[in-house]
């Protein structure tokens, strides 16, 4: 419907269209649309894509998506975001981050930087959402466990993270069951 509305306004939109939604008892509600990939949503989807992303985006720009077949890895993916204490409110910056190398050395784990910076040769926090840790696994539970295991290897003062990512799925509850 959104793309149809853009077309009705004379806009020939081609590219990423990220929708932010919230599940409510009345059903899903739109929070926002962005003309970019969503973060961390993309960080859990793209590791499963076997195709060259550049080729996919060029096909999109040239209205040729119907000429390619997306090929996906069979693995499950889970991403966990590491945040600074206080996020989404006020938070401190400049906290030294350690353990990323250990997490990145784990098979099927990728660490994505968001709110980080290098100061005096040290990697430090520089935002509320600091890192996203994505893991792939042959089952959802294995991917989730691997992601949390990798998160344990990373440390910085004030590190916070949600411990409930994927629990509804593990407990057999529908994600829409709010």
Residue ranges and their predicted role:
Residues 1-18, 34-108:
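Active-site "cap" helix and flanking loop/linker of ATP-utilizing ligase/carboxylase catalytic domains
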Residues 14, 26, 73, 124-126:
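Short coil/turn motifs at beta-sheet boundaries
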């Amino acid at each position: 419907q959104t793309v149809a509305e853009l077309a009705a306004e004379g806009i020939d939109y081609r590219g990423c269209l990220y929708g932010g939604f919230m599940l409510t008892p009345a059903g899903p509600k739109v929070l926002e649309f962005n003309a970019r990939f969503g973060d961390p949503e993309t960080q859990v989807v793209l590791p499963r894509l076997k195709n060259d992303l550049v080729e996919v985006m060029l096909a999109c720009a040239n209205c040729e998506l119907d000429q390619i077949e997306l090929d996906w890895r069979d693995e499950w993916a889970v991403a966990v975001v590491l945040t600074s204490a206080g996020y989404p409110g006020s938070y401190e910056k400049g906290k030294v981050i350690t353990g990323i190398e250990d997490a990145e050395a784990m098979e099927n784990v990728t660490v994505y930087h968001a709110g980080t910076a290098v100061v005096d040769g040290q990697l430090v926090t520089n935002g509320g959402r600091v890192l996203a840790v994505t893991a792939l696994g042959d089952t959802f539970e294995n991917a989730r466990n691997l992601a949390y295991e990798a998160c344990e290897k990373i440390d910085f003062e004030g590190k916070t993270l949600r411990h409930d990512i994927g629990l509804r799925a593990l407990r057999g509850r529908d994600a829409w069951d709010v």
